[in-house]
């Protein structure tokens, strides 16, 4: 089984790199403000019709545009969910959501989290799914990519005050990247058997003679951008383990590729725009090393399973609880690491049913900020924050002013970097503490002891880091949990974007210094090791005490 696991990981990464390389070249053109071939005329007409000016923006203007678009989307989606019973395409006559669930859901999809305190097939109409959630899947993904575009430009421009035009970037990202690729993926899903219709739910007789109501809906179109944009919110409650969303092993493989496609392509694009492709490869090496180790640990833990099962008469100790038999242990383990390394959160297995160590790895991947490939845009700017921190630490060790890509990293940048890195750990630890201190928080726990605490810690980690997956043994649809998680999602998203944009505004105004004999090379294996060590050190120092009370205690008990 070890050979099968190695072959699965190697095949996945090989296909991923082959697909991401050409996409990275296209993204590099957009970062350099070069229209893609054949799009200039269309862009001119659209910009004119929409009244979009291509005048460049400073970091505050760029940030204001991103925040303004997202706040408008939040308000529209909130009221849409409240009043969905007045809107069309609701064949099941589903009522509007409560204010707290509508707020939680609106914040969730605007922040690219897609945490779901509801069951899609029994709560949301087709209109809410399409015009509400799917639209935000596109816009939240485009927002994250636009932020990393601006951040990359900060390193490649010199003595300037502008970072590009947010509206131009958002339109180009949506029209020329997200929509075409999502369309291709959706058509493939439909061909493989995913649903795409507007029919009422269908009553059928099962082979046992019982009656069953089968949910319908425009699934494939939402499923495609759900994976491509690292959104993760399922059309159905079972998410990607549902055969109507993920009908075959081939669609499952494509879903995993779609999750990592844009984050990987952005690393290639960064290397091209920086004029040194080794810089992009360095980031990919660091991400890939952590990723492969984490996949190996989860596969090992799930294959070892629970030895007590053998004593109880089971044929095998392999942990198949909560997993689709059509996917198996190895694929389920790979998917779990992919979806939590990125900020996706889609699942084909119930993470709550993983072994203690198997469930701890996905939780830890979220807690370190989802910088191992990560979300579209957010993963790369999160990892680049750790790059700045690693450069700063190296500068302290050799007694030189830290610099990266020729830009000196001063006190202002390091303060903002520290702020951005500490936002999500603060939310996670304080949120989990608040939940455990209050009756409203503890009453949602369905399991006692360390596993119950793990469910709470996982939920807050998922929300604060904009992942959206869950240990399902937590009854989170209550005013307390909906409001707590909405706050964590909102601050976890925009509380990081704001200092990232401020860092970009500071760096873009600096001159690029030529490399000297004392310059730390940031493209070799030594720096890859330093970067991995920085990520692991921050994660260990921050979360080991909390993890010791949850999954570690469960493993040892």
UniProtKB/Swiss-Prot annotation:
Subcellular location: Cell inner membrane
Presence of keyword Cell inner membrane: yes
Principal location class: membrane
Any one of the GO CC terms: plasma membrane
Membrane topology: Multi-pass membrane protein
Protein origin, superkingdom: Bacteria
Protein keywords: Cell inner membrane, Cell membrane, Ion transport, Membrane, Potassium, Potassium transport, Transmembrane, Transmembrane helix, Transport
Function: Part of the high-affinity ATP-driven potassium transport (or Kdp) system, which catalyzes the hydrolysis of ATP coupled with the electrogenic transport of potassium into the cytoplasm. This subunit binds the periplasmic potassium ions and delivers the ions to the membrane domain of KdpB through an intramembrane tunnel.
Assembly and interaction partners: The system is composed of three essential subunits: KdpA, KdpB and KdpC.
Protein name: Potassium-transporting ATPase potassium-binding subunit
Species this protein is from: Escherichia coli (strain SMS-3-5 / SECEC)
């Amino acid at each position: 089984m070890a050979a099968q696991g190695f072959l699965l990981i190697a095949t996945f990464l090989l296909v991923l790199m082959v697909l991401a390389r050409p996409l990275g070249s296209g993204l590099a053109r957009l970062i350099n403000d070069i229209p893609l071939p054949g799009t200039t005329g269309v862009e001119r007409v659209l910009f004119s019709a929409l009244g979009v000016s291509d005048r460049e923006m400073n970091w505050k203007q760029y940030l204001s545009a991103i925040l303004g678009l997202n706040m408008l989307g939040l308000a529209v989606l909130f009221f849409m969910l409240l009043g969905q019973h007045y809107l069309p395409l609701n064949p099941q006559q589903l009522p509007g959501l409560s204010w707290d669930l509508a707020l939680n859901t609106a914040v969730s999809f605007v922040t690219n989290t897609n945490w779901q305190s509801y069951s899609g097939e029994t709560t949301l109409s087709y209109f809410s799914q399409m015009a509400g959630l799917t639209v935000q899947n596109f816009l939240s993904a485009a927002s994250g990519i636009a932020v990393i575009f601006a951040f990359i430009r900060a390193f490649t421009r010199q003595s300037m005050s502008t970072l590009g035009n947010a509206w131009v970037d958002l339109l180009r990202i949506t029209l020329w990247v997200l929509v075409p690729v999502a369309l291709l993926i959706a058509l493939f899903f439909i061909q493989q058997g995913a649903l795409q219709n507007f029919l009422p739910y269908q009553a059928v007789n099962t082979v046992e003679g019982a009656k069953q109501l089968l949910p319908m809906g425009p699934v494939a179109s939402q499923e495609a951008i759900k994976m491509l944009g690292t959104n993760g919110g399922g059309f159905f409650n079972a998410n990607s383990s549902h055969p109507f969303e993920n009908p075959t092993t081939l669609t499952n493989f494509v879903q995993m590729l779609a999750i990592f496609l844009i984050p990987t392509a952005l690393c290639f694009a960064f290397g091209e725009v920086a004029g040194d492709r080794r810089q992009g490869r360095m980031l990919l090496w660091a991400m890939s090393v952590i990723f492969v180790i984490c996949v190996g640990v989860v596969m090992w833990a799930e294959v070892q399973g629970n030895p007590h099962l053998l004593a109880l008469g089971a044929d095998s100790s392999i942990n198949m609880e909560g997993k689709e038999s059509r996917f198996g242990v190895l694929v389920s383990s790979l998917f779990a690491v992919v979806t939590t390394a990125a900020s996706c959160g889609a699942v084909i297995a119930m993470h709550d049913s993983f072994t203690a160590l198997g469930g701890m790895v996905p939780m830890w991947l979220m807690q370190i900020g989802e910088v191992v490939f990560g979300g579209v845009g957010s993963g790369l700017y999160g990892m680049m924050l750790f790059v700045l921190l690693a450069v700063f630490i190296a500068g302290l060790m050799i007694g030189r002013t830290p610099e990266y890509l020729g830009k000196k990293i001063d006190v202002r940048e390091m303060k903002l970097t520290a702020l951005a890195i500490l936002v999500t750990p603060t939310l996670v630890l304080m949120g989990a503490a608040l939940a455990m201190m209050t009756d409203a928080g503890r009453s949602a726990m369905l399991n006692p002891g360390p596993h119950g605490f793990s469910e709470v810690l996982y939920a807050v980690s998922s929300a604060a880091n904009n992942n959206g997956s869950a240990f399902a043994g937590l009854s989170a649809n209550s005013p307390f949990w909906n409001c707590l998680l909405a706050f964590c999602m909102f601050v976890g998203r925009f509380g990081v974007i704001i200092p990232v944009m401020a860092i970009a505004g500071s760096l873009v105004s600096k001159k690029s210094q030529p490399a000297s004999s004392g310059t730390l090379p940031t493209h070799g294996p030594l720096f890859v090791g330093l970067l991995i060590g920085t990520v692991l050190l921050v994660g260990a120092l921050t979360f080991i005490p909390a993890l010791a009370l949850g999954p570690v205690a469960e493993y040892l008990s």
